């Protein structure tokens, strides 16, 4: 049996994507819509308070295309907190005019290839990646993925050293986009339908295409990568929520 990779796990992660039922939303009066928006922003303000204490983070984006209208990415120390956030949101008036489009549950993850005598949880750089403050980048790209397990192309049957070598080559491509693309990898084995979630942030949306296309030619992706649905969107600052929902 091949050796399993040890992982470092950080904050739990929820990607919550919803579509707006615009036809139903239009039936409300202007005052009713305003009250619903204010109620929602009060919930978001609670998230801001948590982020200010470094006990979680979140991001809010509009989604381009017909897969969804809005994407929320929430990071918290426990799965229970994610559940509480989702439930509180579902109880708002605005949620009555939202249709669930997609969700993904995972935990921020790093592969532990550090020396055995080093405690990774004492490394500030690693802690910043396990418990990240999500950037306010202009654009987001999220997609789930698996490692292939078919015939000779079975990632999990490869020796540890071979997997390490290929992942090192794979990561070199990503490092070329440092300063252009911020990446958050989250593990979801046993949590959701795929094995990982990949969330990318960038101010220049074209960098997503360039990075992912270049990685397609790397063996890790070309031979062993299997991908789910891609979602791409634009940042939705708190102060623009009312305009986004205005009729």
UniProtKB/Swiss-Prot annotation:
EC nos: 1.3.98.5
Pfam families xrefs: Chlor_dismutase
Binding site for Fe-coproporphyrin III: 129, 143-147, 170, 183, 221
Active-site annotation: 143
UniProt GO MF annotations: heme binding; metal ion binding; oxidoreductase activity, acting on the CH-CH group of donors, oxygen as acceptor; peroxidase activity
Source domain of life: Bacteria
Keyword Oxidoreductase: yes
Cofactor: Fe-coproporphyrin III
Catalysis performed (reactions): Fe-coproporphyrin III + 2 H2O2 + 2 H(+) = heme b + 2 CO2 + 4 H2O; Fe-coproporphyrin III + H2O2 + H(+) = harderoheme III + CO2 + 2 H2O; harderoheme III + H2O2 + H(+) = heme b + CO2 + 2 H2O
Pathway recorded for this protein: Porphyrin-containing compound metabolism; protoheme biosynthesis
Cofactor note: Fe-coproporphyrin III acts both as a substrate and a redox cofactor.
Keywords: Heme, Heme biosynthesis, Iron, Metal-binding, Oxidoreductase
GO terms classed as biological process: heme B biosynthetic process
Membrane found in the keyword field: no
PANTHER family the record matches: COPROHEME DECARBOXYLASE, HEME-DEPENDENT PEROXIDASE YWFI-RELATED
Family membership noted in the UniProt record: Belongs to the ChdC family. Type 1 subfamily.
Functional summary from the UniProt entry: Involved in coproporphyrin-dependent heme b biosynthesis. Catalyzes the decarboxylation of Fe-coproporphyrin III (coproheme) to heme b (protoheme IX), the last step of the pathway. The reaction occurs in a stepwise manner with a three-propionate intermediate.
Name this protein carries in UniProt: Coproheme decarboxylase
Species assigned in the record: Bacillus cereus (strain ATCC 10987 / NRS 248)
Gene: chdC
């Amino acid at each position: 049996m091949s050796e399993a990779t040890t992982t470092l796990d950080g904050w739990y992660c929820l990607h919550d994507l919803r579509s707006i039922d615009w036809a139903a939303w239009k039936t409300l009066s202007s005052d009713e819509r305003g009250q619903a928006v204010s109620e929602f922003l009060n919930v978001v303000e609670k998230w801001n308070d948590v982020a200010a204490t470094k006990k979680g983070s979140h991001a809010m984006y509009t989604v381009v295309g017909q897969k969804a209208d809005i994407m929320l990415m929430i990071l918290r120390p426990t799965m229970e907190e994610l559940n509480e956030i989702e439930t509180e949101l579902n109880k708002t008036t605005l949620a009555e005019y939202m249709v669930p489009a997609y969700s993904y549950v995972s935990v921020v993850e790093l592969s532990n290839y550090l020396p055995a005598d080093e405690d990774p949880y004492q490394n500030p750089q690693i802690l910043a990646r396990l418990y990240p403050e999500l950037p306010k980048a202009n654009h987001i790209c999220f997609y789930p993925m698996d490692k292939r397990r078919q015939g000779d192309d079975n990632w999990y049957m490869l020796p540890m050293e071979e997997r390490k070598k290929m992942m090192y080559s794979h990561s070199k491509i990503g490092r070329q986009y440092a300063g252009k693309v911020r990446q958050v990898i989250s593990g979801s084995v046993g949590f959701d339908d795929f094995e990982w979630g990949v969330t990318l942030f960038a101010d220049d949306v074209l960098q997503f295409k360039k990075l992912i296309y270049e990685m397609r030619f790397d063996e890790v992706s070309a031979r062993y990568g299997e991908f789910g649905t891609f979602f791409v969107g634009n940042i939705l600052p708190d102060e623009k929520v009312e305009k986004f929902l205005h009729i």
